[in-house]
Amino acid sequence: MFLDTAKVSVQAGRGGDGMVAFRREKYVPNGGPWGGDGGKGGSVIFKVDEGLRTLMDFRYNRKFKAKSGEKGMTKGMHGRGSEDLIISVPQGTTVRDAETGKVLTDLVEHGQEFVVAKGGRGGRGNIRFATPRNPAPEIAENGEPGEERQLELELKILADVGLVGFPSVGKSTLLSVVSSAKPKIGAYHFTTIVPNLGMVRTKSGESFAMADLPGLIEGASQGVGLGTQFLRHIERTRVILHVIDMSAAEGRDPYEDYVAINKELEAYNLRLMERPQIIVANKMDMPEAKEQLQRFKEQLAAQYDDFEELPMIFPISSLAHQGLDSLLEATAELLAKTDDFLLYDEADFAEDEAYYGFAAEEKAFEISRADDAAWVLSGEKLERLFVMTNLERDESIMKFARQLRGMGVDEALRERGAKDGDIVRIGKFEFEFVD
């Protein structure tokens, strides 16, 4: 089964907790702190695997969680960090944040990797908090939570050439005779319901990847028929072969078909029309095909000014294997002078600070009032400090209180009208405000 979209949730591993320990050995009085740091949590990483062709692996397996780091140990030893969770994805996978819709990465190179959820750092052990004023601290940090996010995956197959056209114009037959691909072929519309990919080799030795895409109909750009499900796969192609049935066997007008398909391509993505097109006049072995082709050329020429260059037209018969060599040679020549089309600019990608730090202008905290009159503190930085505080140790709690004071939380609460004894809430944790 071909699957080109998927939704998954990923959760990186939590960092291991730091340890509170003291050196207790014979003949070593006042041994001091000896608790080590926790290990780093595993990150979740997507890696391109050329052997994959669809997102089928994500149909039933949609949740991925990396392991947490180990806790710090005595003798100042660090906990073992967890290995990263590597998830294989097919070449051509675009990854978006499901909540913001921002593109995180576009994975197109074999072996390319991208960290979609960063593992939490390990909490510091009490050996890290020793100072001349406090040589035996009973403070250790909890491990930092790993990142967690919902992702949308979209596969856009990598092909140099894309075959487009109405259903039953002979796209699958063309692919089957110029490559070793074996697409499903039938005498009815929408025989092809998934993209097919084949490698084409010309007589001069040039080779390129060709994709046979399901037939388009009017309204495809709005989702009619197979619509946008497969229009996305045209986006990575560099050259479009527009296949037209010149036999007009079903009473269709070849030129009207040509105009209709181009309108759908333009409506879906204006940049698709920047790609060079070759018109493939198929089924030329059928009666009246030559007359239809002549009429088509006249109608096409009427739409172009004298100084404009007309698209190349190649009369062929896929079934009779006629005209194929010249078509393939021309396609290879056009590919050689056509650069790749970038799907995304740098501005399209989510900024790195969303993963690895805080923006300079980011608010450290926010204060709101709950229905029960409690003061609610929130903010990514504040909440991160809170979850890394070991609430079982008085010194850790006092350290967190000093951090809040240093961030200006106490002063901000006073300005908002907080009084002695008011309830202050962070997540599910509550404490009394002391003025």
Curated annotation (Swiss-Prot):
Q: Which residues form the OBG-type G domain?
A: 159-336
* Residue ranges annotated for the Obg domain, each copy included: 1-158
Which InterPro entries does this one have? G_OBG (IPR031167), GTP-bd (IPR006073), GTP-bd_Obg/CgtA (IPR014100), GTP-bd_prot_GTP1/OBG_C_sf (IPR036346), GTP1-OBG_CS (IPR006074), GTP1_OBG_dom (IPR006169), GTP1_OBG_dom_sf (IPR036726), OBG_GTPase (IPR045086)
Tell me which Gene3D superfamilies the record gives.
Answer: GTP-binding protein OBG, C-terminal domain, GTP1/OBG domain, P-loop containing nucleotide triphosphate hydrolases
Cofactor dependence = Mg(2+)
Ribosomal protein found in the keyword field:
no
GO molecular function per UniProt: GTP binding; GTPase activity; magnesium ion binding
Pfam family membership, one: MMR_HSR1
Annotated GO biological processes are: ribosome biogenesis
Q: Which domain of life is it from?
A: Bacteria
At which positions is GTP bound? 165-172, 190-194, 212-215, 282-285, 317-319
State the GO CC annotations.
cytoplasm
Which keywords does UniProt give here?
Cytoplasm, GTP-binding, Hydrolase, Magnesium, Metal-binding, Nucleotide-binding
Q: Does the keyword Mitochondrion apply?
A: no
Function of this protein? An essential GTPase which binds GTP, GDP and possibly (p)ppGpp with moderate affinity, with high nucleotide exchange rates and a fairly low GTP hydrolysis rate. Plays a role in control of the cell cycle, stress response, ribosome biogenesis and in those bacteria that undergo differentiation, in morphogenesis control.
What's this protein's name? GTPase Obg
Please name the source species.
Streptococcus equi subsp. zooepidemicus (strain MGCS10565)
